[in-house]
UniProtKB/Swiss-Prot annotation:
Name this polypeptide is given: Small ribosomal subunit protein uS7
Gene (name only): rpsG
GO biological process assignments: translation
Function of the molecule: One of the primary rRNA binding proteins, it binds directly to 16S rRNA where it nucleates assembly of the head domain of the 30S subunit. Is located at the subunit interface close to the decoding center, probably blocks exit of the E-site tRNA.
Coiled-coil residue windows: none
GO MF, any single term: rRNA binding
PANTHER family: RIBOSOMAL PROTEIN S7 (PTHR11205)
One GO CC term on file: small ribosomal subunit
């Protein structure tokens, strides 16, 4: 284990929107260090949302999607006297954002549209409208925390 907490590395805002969350999203989307490909996919998805999204801009829908998917509670396994309990815990803001990004990307990859740009645009629109697989994942996480509320006193 570390002697002290690892310093939080600062992320530069993206060049087009000046948004740090988009940079983190692009970095999570990237495979094999191919950042230019990930950037093309991200900006392509935001442009596709601009065309489909009606009066809202792509960046607004992106921000709504991230906010809608952020979980406030999750469960962690805790062993007490031979039994393992799923203990509900609050999620730190940085982890909320990381989980939201991770869930949106993973469920976008599982979608059936042809290109990743289309998949990501559709998943972001669904997430912004509180539907889709990533929103269901958040709801399931809440249900798990709610079902195990009795073990909340085992928090550490």
């Amino acid at each position: 284990m570390r002697r002290r907490k690892a310093p939080v590395r600062e992320v530069l805002p993206d060049p087009i929107y000046g948004n740090k969350v988009i940079t983190k999203f692009i970095n999570s989307l990237m495979y094999d260090g191919k950042k230019s490909t990930a950037t093309t996919i991200m900006y392509g998805a935001l442009e596709a949302i601009d065309k489909k999204g009606g009066e809202k801009k792509g960046i607004e829908i992106f921000n709504d999607a991230i906010e809608n998917i952020k979980p406030l509670l999750e469960v962690k396994s805790r062993r007490v006297g031979g039994a393992t309990y799923q203990v509900p815990v609050e999620v730190r803001p940085a982890r909320q954002q990381a989980l939201a990004i991770r869930w949106i990307i993973s469920f976008a990859r599982k979608r059936s549209e042809r290109t990743m740009i289309e998949k990501l645009a559709a998943e972001l629109l669904d997430a912004a409208n509180s539907k889709g697989a990533s929103f269901k994942k958040k709801e399931d996480t809440y249900k798990m925390a709610e079902a195990n509320k009795a073990f909340a006193h085992y928090r550490w």
